């Protein structure tokens, strides 16, 4: 890895390490989202407080940082010799930063909103396809975690058709899907045992 690529990847990781669930909650005088509910610093868990604005700001912040990291790498990177592989690494770095943030004790979220932001940075149509899948599943089954898992699993399929099997971002989407689904392992166990709560109820989908 070149020094330039390392700098961009490190910057992406640091951007990802900005946990908006914690930042927004602290700014609004709320408890640390890691101390209640599922313990997950994400929009769903913040919503459990009943503070819809805080949850919305968390969702937007987590999604925006995924887009910003990829967009900056895409716009500025080529000027310094950063190719698509380097941009793909930045996409993964911002996601890993969200999940294991250096600024917050490496205890981060599950990455759904950030993953969507990353997809928007890669290709808006790809992101819209994944987002539409989540919305459709949420409407049908009304389970946030299952909707997120299905959307993540199908994202590489959409990438295959939209970007092509030889695109470096196709591989990136596969890695994102694997990591995000793995972060939902506790939700998968609850889904298999019929204990996962539906949207609007208290649970661990955040």
UniProtKB/Swiss-Prot annotation:
Keyword flag Methyltransferase: no
One Pfam family of this chain: G3P_acyltransf
Protein EC: 2.3.1.275
Transmembrane segments: 4-24, 53-73, 86-106, 116-136, 137-157, 160-180
Reactions this protein catalyses: an acyl phosphate + sn-glycerol 3-phosphate = a 1-acyl-sn-glycero-3-phosphate + phosphate
Protein name: Glycerol-3-phosphate acyltransferase
GO cellular component, one term: plasma membrane
Purpose: Catalyzes the transfer of an acyl group from acyl-phosphate (acyl-PO(4)) to glycerol-3-phosphate (G3P) to form lysophosphatidic acid (LPA). This enzyme utilizes acyl-phosphate as fatty acyl donor, but not acyl-CoA or acyl-ACP.
Pathway the protein contributes to: Lipid metabolism; phospholipid metabolism
Cellular compartment(s): Cell inner membrane
Membrane topology per record: Multi-pass membrane protein
Top-level taxonomy: Bacteria, Pseudomonadati, Pseudomonadota, Betaproteobacteria, Neisseriales
GO MF, any single term: acyl-phosphate glycerol-3-phosphate acyltransferase activity
Record key words, sorted: Cell inner membrane, Cell membrane, Lipid biosynthesis, Lipid metabolism, Membrane, Phospholipid biosynthesis, Phospholipid metabolism, Transferase, Transmembrane, Transmembrane helix
Subunit structure: Probably interacts with PlsX.
Domain of life: Bacteria
GO BP of this protein: phospholipid biosynthetic process
InterPro entries in the cross-refs: G3P_acylTferase_PlsY (IPR003811)
Gene (UniProt): plsY
Family: Belongs to the PlsY family.
